[in-house]
Design a protein with these regions (language model features):
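Structural alpha/beta core scaffold segments of enzyme domains
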Residues: 1-624, 712-721, 728-736
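Amphipathic, heptad-repeat alpha-helical segments used for oligomerization and assembly
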Residues: 528, 541, 686-699
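Cytochrome P450 core scaffold surrounding the K-helix E-X-X-R motif
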Residues: 627-631
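Hydrophobic alpha-helical bundle architecture
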Residues: 635, 657-673, 693-696
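Conserved phosphate/anionic-ligand binding catalytic regions in large, soluble enzymes, centered on
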Residues: 643, 698-709
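Generic long, charged, amphipathic alpha-helical segments
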Residues: 674-692
Length: 736
């Protein structure tokens, strides 16, 4: 439901191109647009660019975010419908096309550490929208959809439209607006008993000017938000009708696959194409700068042919690099004096000198692949001075710009039809649209025939944009009572400063960074720097508790007296997990806490370590304070999924580099947690009333340190490097 086809995009092109540009600016920037609608659309009234109401009283919400399993199409629609006071049974959803009018600039607000004052909001949003148009921002990532677009875009648009409909009804009935109310897609006038549907009023309402700052409902008045309404995307996924990027089929379409330079930065030197060209079904062999592609009448034929090739690549001077050398370079950099400053409170070094005890630790995390279920795929057709692309991306506008550059065209000559994503996790964000670029270049070479590019799983694993490998070094000081009084951390990478800050009251904090760059491609990975930093912080906090000879949970709670929300979440997690109760001798519990993307998550893991040193995670309790909830069922699913995603990385995830290239190639050497070994997960929400936080990523970071801390509780062995299973086996074998 709600995907754009080529015909649909063309039919509303006049709407988008003709000035229906409210986007994520304040609704007050929207002029009367009814007159500029193409004839095919004039039976519909657009109150804002996000809301369209037809005479049959159907409300369509335009959602400028992609669907990749997180339920955002439903959640954002709920937020608009709530403020509109719509009848949910009459509400529909349409994913916004890759057009500048639908740039989603309000995601910028979600990353600001402060609120924009109302008096400045209009100007800020206008400037942000212009920037979003210029850079091509239509992004889904950073857990920003609900807390950015939803809070500042959808709710405001719904409230403004509701006020416009009430004003239109009051004018029609010649009564004060204060005497009118909206409910279930109708405007009611109680004194006279009159009523009119939104559909009957929409054309008049569309002529009115929206309010700049329409009042939003109090939480107590919600009837849609806060309920677990069924998601729009589920039925088509159950019956097989959902179309992902890899599912696209066009008349006369050919198939392509690639072999890229195995060493990042390498280039194609030469390739003898004769062998592949002679194979059944092969139509063309296309040389790219750093890869070779085979085009055939079927994917399997293309794959067999590309595997028959023997391309020669240079290694860009990186053929001697391996993982150990990368880590060694980071360690050397951290030993230097010229380190960047990422944060300072008090006097860390001086406090260490005065501490009763100083604890040192070094942690390491490896590169991680995204390993999404749907490999990289894109379909392209270049003909008659235009280019069309069908792909699943996390930023259609940015992907359109990449496609335009590859096609040698202006963005206006490119149409990108975004599809559902079989996973994203940051792999399909700007900066990683290599698969789109390749598809367009191949399509240009065989124009005007359309071609679908599909990467093999091996290409997908070995040519990812990986989560960065980090080394972090910590020094912590505790006083005579065991309280933490100093925290000094050094780590590599351009990490987010907020991710590196512990949530605990320390008093003296110092954060320093190095910036050693390897040739390995790096990119966003679900929860970004929080995934590394939470492992470091929560592992080290556990070490401080152990040095202080105090219970790890109680130790943390004592350091959270300044933060009632964090304290409440952690205390609740302890209660629900029966922290401190008896366990079998081979079982242990570990705890971890994070605040990420405006959401606080506390997790307790119950772990078994078998006689064979195999880690089994039996249960995870997660307590989440995201302020409030839009769709509780979807929110719980995101936390549960984040825990399983993070657990795969914590136990098994590791990309290693040898001779400049990635060693792992498929799920046999890059394994995942399966249904059989997934833990039982309990999720409890705290509705604190704080501003809405994100949900897609905050469940990921705490699971690795929670499991590592549980392993220590069982074995007494502190694992300071991921993945945990390989590290535990190595540690135990060295002790044998």
């Amino acid at each position: 439901m709600g995907k754009w086809t080529r015909r649909a995009v063309l039919s509303v092109g006049g709407v988008v191109g003709g000035g229906l540009v409210l986007g994520l600016t304040e609704v007050a920037f929207a002029p009367n647009r009814l007159g500029i609608l193409p004839k095919a659309e004039r039976n519909a009234s657009w109150l804002t660019v996000w809301l369209r109401i037809t005479p049959d009283n159907v409300v369509t919400v335009m959602v400028p975010h992609c669907e990749m399993g997180q339920g955002v199409h439903t959640s954002l629609t709920m937020m608009a419908a709530e403020e509109l006071d719509a009848d949910w049974s009459l509400v529909r959803m349409q994913e916004a096309p890759a057009q500048d009018a639908f740039a989603n600039a309000h995601v910028i607000r979600s990353f600001l550490p402060f609120e924009i004052p109302p008096l400045l909001g209009r100007g800020f949003d206008y400037a942000a929208f212009k920037v979003a148009q210029w850079v091509g921002l239509q992004v889904t990532g950073g857990s920003s959809s609900v807390r950015g677009t939803g809070r500042y875009g959808m709710q405001v648009a719904g409230a403004a439209a509701r006020a416009m409909l009430i004003e239109a009804a009051a004018a029609r009935w010649k009564v004060p607006t204060a005497e009118c109310d909206a409910k279930l897609s109708q405007v009611l006038h109680a004194r006279s008993g009159r009523s009119a549907t939104f559909g009957e009023l929409a054309s008049d309402a569309a002529k009115l000017a929206p309010a700049v700052h329409p009042p939003l409902k109090p939480r107590a008045a919600y009837t849609i938000m806060g309920t677990s309404v069924p998601r729009f995307d589920i039925p088509s996924k159950v019956n097989g009708a959902a179309q992902y990027g890899i599912d696209v089929v066009l008349p006369g379409m050919l198939y392509a696959t690639v072999r890229a330079a195995p060493v990042f930065g390498g280039r194609l030197r030469s390739v003898d194409t004769a062998v592949a060209a002679a194979m059944p079904g092969v139509k063309a062999v296309v040389k790219l700068d750093d890869a070779v592609a085979v085009v055939a009448d079927g994917y399997w034929r293309a794959l067999k042919a590309v595997r028959a090739l023997k391309p020669e690549f240079d290694d860009g001077g990186n053929g001697g690099v391996n993982s150990e050398a990368i880590f060694a370079a980071q360690v050397q950099a951290l030993a230097g004096k010229d380190l960047g400053k990422a944060g300072k409170e008090g006097a860390g070094a001086a406090a260490l000198a005065r501490a009763a005890q100083v604890i040192d630790a070094e942690y390491r995390v490896p590169y991680l692949a995204h390993a999404i279920m749907e490999p990289m795929s894109a379909t392209a057709r270049c003909a008659n001075g235009r280019c069309e692309v069908w792909a699943g991306t996390q930023d259609p506008l940015s992907a359109r710009k990449v496609a335009a550059k590859a096609a040698g065209l202006k963005p206006e000559a490119v149409s990108l039809y975004n599809q559902q994503l079989g996973g994203g996790f940051g792999r399909r964000l700007p900066g990683s649209f290599d698969y789109v670029e390749q598809a367009v270049k191949i399509a240009r070479a065989i124009a005007p025939v359309p071609v679908k590019l599909i990467w093999s799983r091996e290409e997908d694993i070995q040519h990812d944009y990986y989560r960065a490998a980090f080394v972090a070094q910590f020094k912590g000081g505790i006083d005579d009572a065991g309280r933490p009084v100093a925290w000094v951390a050094k780590f590599n990478g351009a990490s987010e400063t907020m991710a590196a800050r512990p949530p605990y009251q320390i008093g003296n904090l110092e954060l320093r960074t190095s910036d050693v760059q390897a040739h390995v491609r790096e990119g966003s990975w679900r929860s970004v720097a929080y995934s590394q930093q939470c492992f470091f912080i929560e592992s080290f906090m556990d070490e401080l508790a152990h040095a202080a000879r105090q219970d790890p949970l109680a130790y943390r709670l004592a350091a959270l007296q300044h933060s009632p929300r964090h304290h409440a979440a952690l205390a609740k997690a302890g209660q629900l997990s029966a922290w401190g109760s008896a366990l079998p001798a081979t079982h242990g519990r570990g705890v971890a806490l994070v605040e990420a993307f405006g959401t606080i998550v506390a997790e307790v893991a119950e772990v078994e370590v078998t006689a064979e040193h195999i880690i089994k995670v039996h249960r995870v309790v997660a307590v989440v304070d995201s302020g409030d909830l839009v769709n509780p069922d979807t929110a719980a699913a995101q936390i549960e999924g984040g825990i399983v995603f993070g657990l795969s990385a914590a136990l098994f995830g590791q990309i290693t580099i040898e001779k400049g290239r990635v060693v792992q190639s498929n799920f046999h050497d890059y394994p995942m947690v399966t249904l059989a070994n997934s833990p039982r997960v309990t999720v409890k929400f705290i509705r604190s009333g704080a501003p809405l936080g994100g949900m897609g990523e905050p469940g990921v970071p705490p699971i690795a340190p929670a499991v590592a801390n549980a392993i220590f509780a069982v074995t007494g062995k502190r694992l300071r490097q991921l993945p945990l299973q390989a590290q535990l086996l190595s540690a135990m074998s060295s002790m044998a």
